[in-house]
Amino acid sequence: MSEKKVFVFGSFTEHETRSFFEQKPTKDPQNSKDKCVGSIQFGSLNLAAENSSVNTNGELKKGEADGTVKSAGSQERLDASRPASSDKNNDSDAKLPRKNSLRVPEHVVQNGIIKEISESNKSLNNGVAVKTDPIGLDNLSMSDGESDPVYKASSSKFQALDNEDFSSDSSSGSIQRKKNLKVPTESVPPVKDFTPRGLINAGNLCFLNATLQALLSCSPFVQLLQKIQLQDIPKADSPTLAAFSEFISELDVPSSSSIRNNVTVVEAGRPFRPAMFEGVLRNFTPDVLNNMSGRPRQEDAQEFLSFIMDQMHDELLKLKEQSPKVTASKSSVISSANDDGDEWETVGPKNKSAVTRTQSFVPSELSEIFGGQLKSVVKAKGTKASATVQPYLLLHLDIHPDGVQGIEDALHLFSAQEDLEGYRASVTGKTGVVSASKSIKIQKLSKIMILHLMRFSYGSQGSTKLRKGVKFPLELNLNRSHLVSLSNESLRYELVATITHHGWDPSKGHYTTDARRKNGQWLRFDDASVTPIGTKLVLHDQAYVLFYKQV
């Protein structure tokens, strides 16, 4: 018999059976094989329809790949990663970043639903128009206890990742750290733009995630982290610096931007869990246990930001075997007679003298980025004016007065003169209450200016939130009236990040961050979700913390 065996079913004569074996193929088997392979369809993805696209009705048409969402006029897209498998046998794969192409920026596929992220006040949910968040954040996942229906979300874009249990660093879903070579800090190259990566929220940790994403938009701060990463940081003495050193190593730096089919491609790495900050959170809230596996309450993002900045400032000084006499968090606006510092009499431009006292402050690499100086002048009847120079890392702006409608109004109120009630001064040897006034102006500008909009107030009946709209610009030009004197410093700042609180109570609600990339593209970070947005969505009026970079 022939080498190939053929089974014939049915009743055939001997002549008919012999003819089957002698029959020659009519086509070349190899050509037939090639033709079949080219038309194989795997699942719902038709490889032969690679040049098709999705029209407005969800039907395929020629021109784009099946499964790709493209908006008309869209010039950028995000290579967003997808949740990894929860299979425990794939631990080795979980350490590698996964990157897939998702064409956006105006449409996002969320749990199988195409959602449009636009400036309009309506979106489609399975073809039905629904009410959206006025800030464009209708798909946020809220913390437990938050009942605001406007910002309540039904699902999270990376829900599968959010529910994963990460018990150790090896299973945290993070990429493997590269071996760091210890080189002089002078050889650190200019800061590059990091691949955006979402941060997993195990429960009430969005204040941490939002703060970290905002800081990553500040290029001088990122460059500082790169220098820290090249040093041996003792974790016991410098837990905050050690956490940031490990955190920055989890981020990839793209070698170059890529353009495909006249569309700029932005790569996004797989979301990971910032477990390296567990010790920092323990120091921030010693009364809260199980910090990274879920917390019983939400924390104030601005308070956490101030805490880690103060900690980094002190730890950087310890590395240089220095210790500050007065830190920014402990400084006061009005100096007392017991304050440490130098005191001298200065003469102003109008030949008016004032007793000036400068608080002792040892600068650090962090304060060189975020730090500036304020000068507070108190004028009392019958006495010489007294001035106090103090450092700052961020400016607290009162937005409660009705006249404050924007950031410029809040800055004007910040530097305006105010009357002091019950001010006691020694006049002609007698101490008594005299009329006095106080004004605060900026003596030294910071490279990164952080503006805290004071939306929360605390009283005997608990905390309340002011939800009034406060406008802020993409480009901020400081008025010279905010400064002590004219200088050669640039008064122009560009917005690089915002932190927004959604909800009514600081112990509840949710935090998100809008951050600008080096190429000017704005991204919205909502825990594990990373979404490109337009500037109209960035310039909403409910921001809580603003980050401006001097240009």
From Swiss-Prot:
Query: Region (Disordered): which ranges?
Result: 51-104, 163-188, 329-349
Q: Which UniProt keywords apply?
A: Hydrolase, Protease, Thiol protease, Ubl conjugation pathway
Domain of life, source organism: Eukaryota
Give the EC class as a word: hydrolase
Protein's GO biological process: protein deubiquitination; proteolysis
Listed under catalytic activity are: Thiol-dependent hydrolysis of ester, thioester, amide, peptide and isopeptide bonds formed by the C-terminal Gly of ubiquitin (a 76-residue protein attached to proteins as an intracellular targeting signal)
Name of the gene encoding the protein in the UniProt record? UBP24
For this entry, the protein name equals Ubiquitin carboxyl-terminal hydrolase 24
Q: Which GO terms describe its molecular function?
A: cysteine-type deubiquitinase activity
Family membership = Belongs to the peptidase C19 family.
Query: Catalytic center at which residues?
Result: 206, 510
Where the record annotates domain USP, the positions are 197-551
Q: What is its EC number?
A: 3.4.19.12
**Comp. bias intervals (Polar residues):** 329-338
This molecule's function is given as: Recognizes and hydrolyzes the peptide bond at the C-terminal Gly of ubiquitin. Involved in the processing of poly-ubiquitin precursors as well as that of ubiquitinated proteins.
Task: Cite the PANTHER family for this sequence.
Answer: UBIQUITIN CARBOXYL-TERMINAL HYDROLASE, UBIQUITIN CARBOXYL-TERMINAL HYDROLASE 10
Q: Which PROSITE patterns match?
A: USP_1 (PS00972), USP_2 (PS00973), USP_3 (PS50235)
**InterPro entries given for it?**
Papain-like_cys_pep_sf, Peptidase_C19, Peptidase_C19_UCH, USP_CS, USP_dom
Keyword Protease part of the UniProt annotation: yes
